[in-house]
From Swiss-Prot:
GO terms for cellular component: Arp2/3 protein complex; cytoplasm; lamellipodium; nucleus; site of double-strand break. Component of the Arp2/3 complex composed of ACTR2/ARP2, ACTR3/ARP3, ARPC1B/p41-ARC, ARPC2/p34-ARC, ARPC3/p21-ARC, ARPC4/p20-ARC and ARPC5/p16-ARC. The lineage of its organism: Eukaryota, Metazoa, Chordata, Craniata, Vertebrata. Pfam families: P21-Arc (PF04062). It comes from the Eukaryota. The gene is Arpc3. This is Actin-related protein 2/3 complex subunit 3.
Amino acid sequence: MPAYHSSLMDPDTKLIGNMALLPLRSQFKGPAPRETKDTDIVDEAIYYFKANVFFKNYEIKNEADRTLIYITLYISECLKKLQKCNSKSQGEKEMYTLGITNFPIPGEPGFPLNAIYAKPASKQEDEMMRAYLQQLRQETGLRLCEKVFDPQSDKPSKWWTCFVKRQFMNKSLSGPGQ
């Protein structure tokens, strides 16, 4: 079974480094254009997460795949936090905190995927990439809470938390031991 790839890459999609700046249906401020379709890259990443997380190798077919990879790795980080939460409201607070926490971007020493991501070419591109990744993180965390928490019990679903120990591409956005 092959890995799932993003279908959202258009020829006129703007790039930051070698990552696609894709439109989002987001309530958070950031450089991403507004998405008018029903599905955006965050929906796609959440939908494909359970299948893609099993892959140790992932062939990048376009720049949107790099965005998909980042969100997939971020979902893994989110699940580590969400499994410890007792309620959806606690989970939303954790996701907000994780979303705005200082994080490395491509080209910086702590970023785990510097081999496949180009670092920003200028200070302006650096700021735009950081803002876009933060917008992705915030939106992903919020939407993931909607999927992970069971509305009846207000507890994290075991069908999501069972993926906590899985590492997509044998990588993690957090450092070793975190």
